[in-house]
Amino acid sequence: MGLGLGFWGYALFLSLFLKQSHCQEPNTDGFFVSEFYKQMGLSSSQAYNFSAPFCSWQGLFCDSKNEHVIMLIASGMSLSGQIPDNTIGKLSKLQSLDLSNNKISALPSDFWSLNTLKNLNLSFNKISGSFSSNVGNFGQLELLDISYNNFSGAIPEAVDSLVSLRVLKLDHNGFQMSIPRGLLGCQSLVSIDLSSNQLEGSLPDGFGSAFPKLETLSLAGNKIHGRDTDFADMKSISFLNISGNQFDGSVTGVFKETLEVADLSKNRFQGHISSQVDSNWFSLVYLDLSENELSGVIKNLTLLKKLKHLNLAWNRFNRGMFPRIEMLSGLEYLNLSNTNLSGHIPREISKLSDLSTLDVSGNHLAGHIPILSIKNLVAIDVSRNNLTGEIPMSILEKLPWMERFNFSFNNLTFCSGKFSAETLNRSFFGSTNSCPIAANPALFKRKRSVTGGLKLALAVTLSTMCLLIGALIFVAFGCRRKTKSGEAKDLSVKEEQSISGPFSFQTDSTTWVADVKQANAVPVVIFEKPLLNITFSDLLSATSNFDRDTLLADGKFGPVYRGFLPGGIHVAVKVLVHGSTLSDQEAARELEFLGRIKHPNLVPLTGYCIAGDQRIAIYEYMENGNLQNLLHDLPFGVQTTDDWTTDTWEEETDNGTQNIGTEGPVATWRFRHKIALGTARALAFLHHGCSPPIIHRDVKASSVYLDQNWEPRLSDFGLAKVFGNGLDDEIIHGSPGYLPPEFLQPEHELPTPKSDVYCFGVVLFELMTGKKPIEDDYLDEKDTNLVSWVRSLVRKNQASKAIDPKIQETGSEEQMEEALKIGYLCTADLPSKRPSMQQVVGLLKDIEPKSNQ
């Protein structure tokens, strides 16, 4: 008997030990997922508490009984190595699996037993070898994305079992051989991407008619051969990219009325396109037929009125005149290089106001370059023609701010000014320097923005040698101080040469110093304008020596100034005043990284400057201020003393400061939902679309800006890393009214994506209630902040009482209550209870107002 008790006591001890060590019951979905994370290198401290109920973990969604995982999202979690057996392969009810953006190298043998899967995303990993024919087990699969891996061998014929498949992405791998005939069994496909592989052979017979719902097809970058008739029966196609293959025949059979994007470049298509342009081409927005064997004369393009991108370069067209394109009013990109054009470049090109790229190089064009006063033009190539005469001043004046230009191998004349020898050899080879004796020697020196009248006065003065008149004009106009109404401040050559530091500037809350000797020797980097030679001297001029009149805000990271850089670039200049532990090179590397992060809902970082120990970030200016001002009726430019209301940017009119007030676009449910969804998308991109993920750390209403189209843009992302370890806790952890509960504990962890989720929840509450996070009237004396007030109402099923009266009658009250419930989820006390931002985006999309709201 004693032995029996000892045995059962030991068994009980072992059971408790196992439960404590694994934190989940063995052979449960929670156990399998926790083992998966642990063996793939993810620890409990990385936003997961393995002792908590598994259905509360980030990225996990369970069935209604909280017994089985039906969705697992682990994108960008730095998972590495081979997925072990007896982990996720045991999730018998799993419907959706997203393991994208990791370093996974191989799949387990039991992976193919997940026969309930509907969505599988393994993209952007390092999985190699052949793709198993066991994929045929996934009969319910609707989305399969294994792009950007190292798969090789043949695409398995077993794909014919995927009868429910709608989206197939196998691009950017090493798949070989031909496209399997089994693919034709997937008749529900809407999108196919097999691009950037090593596929060869011809398309299976009946390929064009096999997919009646197909809208998107990309076969680019393979060695597939076939004819235009292979695509004749695609009735629903809107996007077609077959570039870089071996297709031939006429392009006639390719075009359908539904087609909007067509890239047929780098193939062997033949024939005359002028006789083939008909109604099937009318929906085209993007057309690339470059590097084929097309012939005839280019004409009839005026029918393609929706076209934005046109590339016909490197074909075998007969010699002909420049085609009429002035009717293509939306054209942004035009490449007619090496198309055997003759005659003149028509001056009507100036009517293409949206044109950004013009390439007519390698032709037989003669005559003068017309005056092209196209505001958006950033690239021009007219090289290797027979052009003569002066390069128009309207073009020369734009060159310092262009991304690419080439006038070489013509008979043009121009004034070389201050162009470097390298630029002269590369872009003006064969042209003649025509500078008159009195020409402006600084024509191409990057200068501060001045008014049009001043530019004209200086140009006239310097080109006529009337020194006395020039001196008078310079005295009258050359030294005006830049003010808020747009007047310009300029410095004489003598004054400019005397600009030397160190420089000290003061605001109400801080004094900052730029310890540099010569302002014009400190470069300013503008990411998308590499030819601009801007210096710290230009920043001084743009901000009137960082004058208080140009101060927009005195925020947490430092003061923000408004200014215009050379080229009319409207910017907000943020001085990062807190000491950084990073070297200049490390800080520059961090800023360069942030400059590469692009998203429609992020304020773009356009450049930076390292001035001594001072780091300066340069942002695109946001015309419509920030959300805090818009919601709480503050005039643009007004700074309040509360820390959570800093970083306000202003908007001016000729009559002074403008106040949008409550009657503007903000007073509708549709607009506020748009702001919420855009901000959520920005955060989801930072958390899940960047590698490594970026934690914002200070999401608040005043960090959400509105561009000229009233689209929301999140600012200040990633700035904390520029300081290294030089920031104190108060700055790292956010602003009063937005602080997550975990940051109020004596010993708390560093910010995580879930702390951003909490802050977003507060912003969502602001949008729905119109109230500030703290120090507002919450209609209940017991509540001292917005979060506790709204959460209390939601718990009592009285969420409608919190809705801002200004928007209550502008849409569905049910949708507005759902938005408050989403905010409730985001502001949960425990980080593990909060959804991810990807999930928040999905929830907000589910309550998107209809078009008539």
From Swiss-Prot:
**Which sequence ranges are marked TM in the entry?**
457-477
Q: Where in the cell is it found?
A: Membrane
Where, by residue number, is the active site? D698
Q: Name one GO molecular function term.
A: protein serine kinase activity
Q: Which UniProt keywords apply?
A: ATP-binding, Glycoprotein, Kinase, Leucine-rich repeat, Membrane, Nucleotide-binding, Phosphoprotein, Receptor, Repeat, Serine/threonine-protein kinase, Signal, Transferase, Transmembrane, Transmembrane helix
Identify residues that carry Phosphotyrosine.
Answer: Y619, Y738
Question: What is the protein name stated in its UniProt record?
Answer: Probable LRR receptor-like serine/threonine-protein kinase At2g24230
| Protein's organism | Arabidopsis thaliana
Origin organism lineage: Eukaryota, Viridiplantae, Streptophyta, Embryophyta, Tracheophyta
